[in-house]
């Protein structure tokens, strides 16, 4: 593999190429955009939709697009039906903001959801990059999306649990040091 990395960002100061150049000269596109929470707890997928619309308009190549953002189960299928010419794979990131580079290099597993032909192509890239040392789970869109949601929920549950234990400990004079 030869990695010729191109970066497109809406902030042109961070871009190395236009979106059209990036999309049409890439075999695999990593798409990481925010999916902020709405007041009711749902997620806002308008940014993902907008970027996929733009890619759909300018794509002349056969690139695979990795959706890395947190999406509720069923969302990638929705986008796959809305943009049938796009080859989508849901590939959630399990990165912390503080250690994103380190977390990417030291992944415990890679989740790929989508059409088997597309996930196989992406798995080849990851196997090459990580020298077959990181387990790769290939599944469908919905399962991959649920794995990501379960991971996020489990982390939140652990934090809530420890906060509760701290409150109990404080009431009974537990020494946390």
Sequence positions of predicted segments:
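NAD(P)-binding Rossmann-fold cofactor-contacting core
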Residues: 1-17
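Internal alpha-helical scaffold of NAD(P)-dependent oxidoreductase catalytic cores
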Residues: 4, 80-91, 96, 100-177
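Active-site flanking residues adjacent to catalytic metal/cofactor-binding acidic residues
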Residues: 8-9, 67, 163
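Short, charged/polar "capping" segments at the starts of alpha-helices
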Residues: 12-17, 73-75, 117-121
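A structured beta-alpha segment of the ubiquitous adenosine-cofactor-binding alpha/beta core
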Residues: 14-22, 37, 54
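A short, aliphatic-rich alpha-helical micro-motif
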Residues: 20-26, 105
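Rossmann-like NAD(P)(H) cofactor-binding subdomain of soluble oxidoreductases
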Residues: 28, 36-99
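Structural motif
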Residues: 30-32, 111
């Amino acid at each position: 593999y030869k990695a010729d990395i191109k970066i497109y960002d809406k902030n042109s100061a961070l871009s190395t190429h236009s979106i059209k150049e990036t999309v049409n000269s890439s075999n695999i596109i990593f798409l990481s955009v925010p999916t902020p929470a709405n007041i009711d707890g749902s997620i806002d997928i308008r940014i993902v939709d907008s970027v996929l619309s733009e890619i759909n308009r300018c794509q002349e190549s056969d690139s695979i697009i990795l959706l890395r953002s947190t999406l509720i189960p069923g969302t990638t299928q929705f986008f796959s039906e809305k943009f049938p010419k796009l080859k989508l794979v849901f590939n959630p990131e399990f990165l912390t903001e503080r250690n994103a580079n380190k977390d990417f290099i030291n992944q415990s597993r890679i989740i790929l959801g989508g059409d088997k032909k597309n996930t196989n192509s992406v798995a080849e890239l990851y196997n090459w990059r990580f020298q077959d040392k990181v387990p790769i789970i290939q599944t469908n869109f919905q399962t991959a999306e649920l794995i990501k949601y379960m991971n996020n929920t489990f982390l939140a549950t652990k934090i809530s649990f420890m906060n509760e234990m701290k409150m109990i400990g404080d009431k009974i004079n537990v020494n946390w040091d």
